[in-house]
Regions:
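Non-catalytic DNA-recognition/assembly elements of restriction-modification systems
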Residues: 1-6, 30, 128, 132-154
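Short beta-alpha junctions and helix-cap segments that line functional grooves
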Residues: 9-11, 70-72, 114-116
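A short glycine-rich beta-alpha junction/loop motif
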Residues: 76-84, 116-133
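A generic structural signal for residues embedded in beta-strands
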Residues: 60-61
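Sequence-specific dsDNA recognition surfaces
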Residues: 1-12, 26-55
Length: 154
């Protein structure tokens, strides 16, 4: 897991000639795919961020609007209200897809704190979330059932 960062807004060197997508919660949608972002950061911002989150990464909001999950359609950086989750334990992304659906439920059961603008999970409460992790075959079955139900809602 890795928590994002926001470059200083007053320093234009990070925001001018943006080359890399920068995700904020407003770019995410419940159970969605982040394909575009409202903002991007420059080459100068790379030194602040470290590794970019690759396409396919599961991201989740944990501040203000706790538990929104999305998948990155492209490599991107993100702000400090979002966490990248790397459950790449299998080539078919079964664990990632399972967490994509289960984390919105589990994260809202966590020890959230009231902040000025809404609920938030801190690093300790994120680490203390108890996640049910059935075997990969069972995760695949659960995800298939959830996606079938979502398809019926469309």
């Amino acid at each position: 897991m890795s928590i994002g960062k926001t470059p200083p807004r007053g320093e234009t060197k990070y925001w001018t000639n943006g080359k890399y997508p920068w995700v904020s919660i407003s770019d995410m949608s419940d159970y969605g795919l982040v394909t575009t972002t409202k903002e991007s950061v420059s080459e100068n911002a790379k030194s602040l961020f470290g590794e970019i989150s690759p396409a396919g990464t599961l991201i989740m909001s944990f501040k203000l609007t706790v538990g929104i999950t999305s998948l990155l359609n492209t490599s991107a950086y993100h702000n400090e209200a979002i966490i990248s989750i790397y459950p790449f334990v299998d080539k078919n992304y079964q664990a990632r897809n399972f967490l994509f659906h289960i984390l919105p439920i589990i994260s809202n059961l966590g020890d959230t704190k009231d902040a000025i603008k809404g609920k938030t999970l801190n690093s300790k409460s994120l680490n203390n979330l108890l996640l049910p992790l059935p075997p990969l075959n069972e995760q695949r079955r659960i995800v298939a059932m959830i996606e079938l139900l979502f398809d019926k809602l469309k």
